[in-house]
Amino acid sequence: WPVGAMAEILLPATAHAEWSLVGAALALVLGKQSHQRAVLVSPPWQVFTPFAEYSGIAARQLCCIHPAQKPGRVADADSVWVSEQALKCRDVCAVLAWLPHAQSQALRRLQLLAAQQRQLLWVFRPEQARGQSSPAPLRLCLKVLDKTLQVRVIKRRGPPLERVIELPLLNQRLQDELLAQADRKAQSRQDAEALLESLKAGRLLSSMEVPS
């Protein structure tokens, strides 16, 4: 991932594949700088703590900000402003911003700030923005197919890359943990049902006892 430059990620609204793509890099950066934070601006979902932790990211290092859209303001203007302030903060090592309606001028400001501050900056936008011009040196388009994340590089420094890159949607460690959690929940449900049946049977026997 380019440090000091914007990486623009284009993806369908229902993909929710951001973490699968950038999680490993974010874990590496935060692991080396335990006092630093990553700022998530206007994420469309709530951070799933086990997902983060099993990606190697401490939840305390993630700061989620949802700026309110003020009446009369240009769409995403407040989210852009928060992203700018985060890029300027020396306690922040990475900014992840969801800016579906950001204008080109705002994106240019973010790209310039990322370069000045030597920060990691990921900007997530809808795939419909692919036809728009962008100051990002790196632009990727994502698609989710079954358990695979397909990544197409549509802009980068150097020669173009025609082939599609395929990545696992979830890392194996996280898949194992989610399956284990599901098994534990299923077992707990079975144990609870067995206990309930036992209690019902006990009450039935008590009601059938004949007083001496």
Protein language model features and the residues they cover:
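N-terminal regions of ATP-driven nucleic-acid and macromolecular assemblies
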Residues: 1-212
